[in-house]
Amino acid sequence: MCDLNKTGQGQVECFMWHEGQGRRGSNEIGSCLLKYLEYKASAQENVEVVFYSDNCAGQQKNKFILAGYFYALSKYNIKSITHKYLIRGHTQNEGDNVHSVIEKHVKRALKSGPIYTPDQYVSLVQTAKKTGLPYKVQEMSYADFVDLKKLSEQTSFNFKKDSSGEVVKLANAAIIRIEKENLDKFLYKTSYSEPEYRVVEIKQRTTRTNQTFDNVKLEPAYRDILPISKKKYDGLMFLLRMNTIKKCYSPFYNSLKVSNDVD
């Protein structure tokens, strides 16, 4: 996350985890967004948040991320959330610049020797920026990730058509906006040149088991650390035996959980 203000780039927050702690899907991305939103709401009242991101529909342009936004607006002191998806191949955001700075710093470090553990990457990210505010790192564990798919089910969060009767295709959205005062709907555009927002009403089925965003409790996405494949684990153990990975780093690798599934 990269804060932008009138003077340019502000504080950068980097959320990091390895594959034994989480995957790279909507639950993980959404959990990071919720942590960020909770922090922003605690630091400033009635904040209006605008996110800029790439167009990765699988991770951040779907109804599970939207459900997370509705939850945040219901729970936190946030006035509105707007998410703008940048046009593929035509835009570059501040996040791209941050990634470039980190990548160059890592490449320089690799000239001095190997990087053996995720902790070393954390240190490199924290020291990558040489001027201004250093990058902050939030290290995520499996216990930090919430199940946004479950949240969507618990609240019967659903929608099909906009107010004009057109089927809503989030994959085509360029801008999505949700307002605290109107949590029964969200607004979206399919292009930046579109003059008016399209309105989408949220359809929630009423049953005895339904919960609202006000009273729902977030469920954990994982109950334990995630296993890595046996093939990958065996490869790492081989590198340890050959001393390609130094023995002093063995506690981290020995702590990894291995899958019983056959590759």
What residue spans do the PLM features occupy?
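Extended mixed-charge, aromatic/glycine-enriched low-complexity segments
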Residues: 1-263
